[in-house]
Amino acid sequence: MAKELRFGDDARLQMLAGVNALADAVQVTMGPRGRNVVLEKSYGAPTVTKDGVSVAKEIEFEHRFMNMGAQMVKEVASKTSDTAGDGTTTATVLARSILVEGHKAVAAGMNPMDLKRGIDKAVLAVTKKLQAMSKPCKDSKAIAQVGTISANSDEAIGAIIAEAMEKVGKEGVITVEDGNGLENELSVVEGMQFDRGYISPYFINNQQNMSCELEHPFILLVDKKVSSIREMLSVLEGVAKSGRPLLIIAEDVEGEALATLVVNNMRGIVKVCAVKAPGFGDRRKAMLQDIAILTKGQVISEEIGKSLEGATLEDLGSAKRIVVTKENTTIIDGEGKATEINARITQIRAQMEETTSDYDREKLQERVAKLAGGVAVIKVGAATEVEMKEKKARVEDALHATRAAVEEGIVAGGGVALIRAQKALDSLKGDNDDQNMGINILRRAIESPMRQIVTNAGYEASVVVNKVAEHKDNYGFNAATGEYGDMVEMGILDPTKVTRMALQNAASVASLMLTTECMVADLPKKEEGVGAGDMGGMGGMGGMGGMM
C-alpha cells in the first residue's frame, strides 16, 4: 500500500494539532470543579464521565497524522492509569505542556536531542524531590481523603474505601460490583472463600439459607477424582469415631463414592459435604496447597507419594467453621500456623514480581488476599444505569489511588507538590544551553496541572500560581471553596506514585515527539464511484408482469 510521508516541522505541527485537540477534551474534567464529558455509544444511552482516560480512549481523528499524535498521548493516559490507577488527566496536561514549549524551542533552532536530555535530567530531579516530600499514608482518615479527591470530591466513596481497607487490610482484595439500591453498600467475606459450591444438594443442612454449615470440621484435600468409596473408608471411619464433621475438597466426587457419602450424611452416621477444588490445572494444585497451609492439612496427591487409602486423621486440615452454598465455599479461622501462612504469602508475592501477565498477577493477588484473610465487596448504588456506570468508574479510580497512596505515600494535592518540586531545578545545570532550555521547559510544564485546576474552577491561573509559589510547604489553593491554606489540613492529598508516574510518562512520550523528524502513514483509499450505466441491466425486469 502506498504511504504518505511528512518531515520536520510539518510532521511535528500535525502531531501537535492532534495532541492539542485531545488535551482540550480531557483537561475540562480536571479538578473539583471539572466539567463532564458526554460520550456517544453505538447503542444505548450515552456515557457521562469525568474520568480523563475514558474520554481519551474514545477520541480518534480522521486525519492520520493528527491521529498519530493523539494516540501517543492516549498511551500516556492509559499507561498512567494501568500503573498508578489515576492521574490520567494530569499526565495528559503535562504531556501537552512539555510538547508545546518544546516545539517552540525546536522551531527556534535548538537541538531536539539536547532538549530531551535536559527534560530527562529535570524529571529525575523532580521525582527525587517528590519522593523526599512524600509522607506515609497510614491512617483511615488519610486513605478516605485520597479516595475522596480521586472520586471527584465524593466523600461517601472515600469513606467506604477507607472502611473496606480497615476491614480486610491493605493487602486484602476489594472488588466493585453493581448494587441494587440507591446507597453504596460494603460487605466483607472473612476467611478464605472460593467459587465452588456443594456437589449435591443433599448435603444441605440449613434449609433456611440453603447452605451446608459445618462446625469445627476436618478437611480432606484430594488432588484427583474420587469415584470409589473403598479408597476413603479408613478416613471416614476415623472421622465417624471422632464425631466431627468432614469437608472433602477434590477434583470431583462421583458415582459410588458420592452416593455413599449422601446416604451416610442423610442417616447421620457422619456429617459430610463434598465440593470441587477451585481453579484448573496448575492453579488448582497451588490453591489446594494454599488451603492445606491455611488449615494445617496435607494435600493427598500421588505426585508426592500419598494415596487416599493410606490417609489418616493427621493428614486432614481443620477449621473453626465452614459454610458451603450453591456457589461458594468459605473457610473461617483455619488452624494453620501464622508463620507458615506468612511464608506462603511471601512466596506468592515473589511470583507476582516475576510474572509478566496482568491476568496471572491479578489471580496471585487474589490468592494473597484469601490467605491474608478477607475480601471486601463494594456495591455501588445509583438511580439510573448511566449514573451507575459513571459512579462505578469513579469508585474503581479511587480504589487504585488509595492503593497507590498506601504503597508510596502522599503529597499535597491540587498541583502544589509539583510547584514545590520546582525548587529541585534551581541548582540543576545541563551540559549546554539547549539542555538548560530542556530543564526550563519542564519547570514551566509542571505548573500546568495547577493552572488547569484553577482555570476550570473559574479563577485567574497566573495570580493563584504566583501566590502559591511565594509560600512554602503545603500552602495551596482549594479550588472547590476558593480558599488558600494548608492542603493537607484541608484534606487535599495526592498519592506520590500517581504524581510521579504522570510526570514520568508525560515527559517520556513528549520527548519522543520532540525528537520526531519523519512520520509515515497510509494514503487514504480513493472511493471508486459506481457508474449509473451499470443499472441498465435492470431493464429486463419488465418481463416480471407475467408472474402476476
From Swiss-Prot:
Pfam families per the UniProt record, alphabetical: Cpn60_TCP1
Judged by the first EC level, this protein's enzyme class is isomerase
Gene3D superfamilies assigned to the protein according to its UniProt record, in alphabetical order: GroEL, GroEL-like equatorial domain, TCP-1-like chaperonin intermediate domain
* Positions of ATP binding: 29-32, 50, 86-90, 414, 478-480, 494
What is one term from the GO cellular component aspect held by the record? host cell endosome membrane
Q: Any idea which UniProt keywords this protein has?
A: ATP-binding, Chaperone, Cytoplasm, Isomerase, Nucleotide-binding, Stress response
- Coiled coil ranges: none
Catalysed reactions, as listed in the record:
ATP + H2O + a folded polypeptide = ADP + phosphate + an unfolded polypeptide
The answer on whether this UniProt entry bears the keyword Cytoplasm reads yes
Which InterPro entries does the record match to this protein?
Answer: Chaperonin_Cpn60_CS (IPR018370), Cpn60/GroEL (IPR001844), Cpn60/GroEL/TCP-1 (IPR002423), GroEL-like_apical_dom_sf (IPR027409), GROEL-like_equatorial_sf (IPR027413), TCP-1-like_intermed_sf (IPR027410)
What are the BP-aspect GO terms?
adhesion of symbiont to host cell; protein refolding; regulation of entry of bacterium into host cell
Q: Which family does it belong to?
A: Belongs to the chaperonin (HSP60) family.
Q: Which PANTHER family match?
A: 60 KDA HEAT SHOCK PROTEIN, MITOCHONDRIAL (PTHR45633)
* Name this protein carries in UniProt: Chaperonin GroEL
Taxonomy-wise, where does this protein's organism fall, top ranks first? Bacteria, Pseudomonadati, Pseudomonadota, Gammaproteobacteria, Legionellales
Gene responsible for this protein = groEL
